[in-house]
């Protein structure tokens, strides 16, 4: 089965996404990169664009992002509500992964590509939203 990973580097106003695919012959290809607004409309456009990259229903799709402050939360909740597989990774894990690759350039686009590579190489756990009670307590 082919594996489609969407790496996401998110900030307050926008986010970059990079789609990488690992095919059955184990080759890895970049399918595309694009930026979107960090808004409800941006989320819809992003999901539509992402799912168009699937060749068939046999492909496994996973969205991978860093836990950066609270900026990732709205997108993670949106994707989860759309029954998508989401993985949220601690920022220090991504930082150490970038160091291991000896990546010198630091841009949102490069970070999205690196996050996608991280997701391609690993079996990541599904993110689950916190319960409404905990979310309310945290937001106090």
Where are each of the predicted segments found?
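Phosphate- and other anionic-substrate recognition elements at nucleic-acid/protein interfaces
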Residues: 1-140
């Amino acid at each position: 089965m082919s594996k489609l990973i969407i790496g996401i580097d998110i900030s307050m106003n926008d986010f970059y996404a990079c789609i990488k695919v690992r095919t059955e012959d184990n080759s890895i290809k970049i399918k595309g990169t694009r930026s979107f607004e960090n808004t409800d409309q941006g989320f819809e456009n992003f999901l539509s664009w992402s799912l168009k990259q699937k060749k068939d229903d046999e492909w496994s799709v996973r969205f991978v992002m860093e836990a950066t402050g609270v900026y990732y939360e709205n997108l993670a909740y949106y994707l989860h509500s759309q029954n998508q597989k989401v993985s949220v990774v601690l920022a220090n894990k991504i930082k150490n992964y970038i160091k291991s690759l000896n990546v010198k350039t630091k841009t949102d686009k490069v970070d999205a590509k690196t996050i996608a590579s991280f997701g391609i190489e690993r079996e990541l756990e599904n993110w689950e939203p916190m319960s409404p009670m905990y979310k309310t307590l945290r937001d106090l």
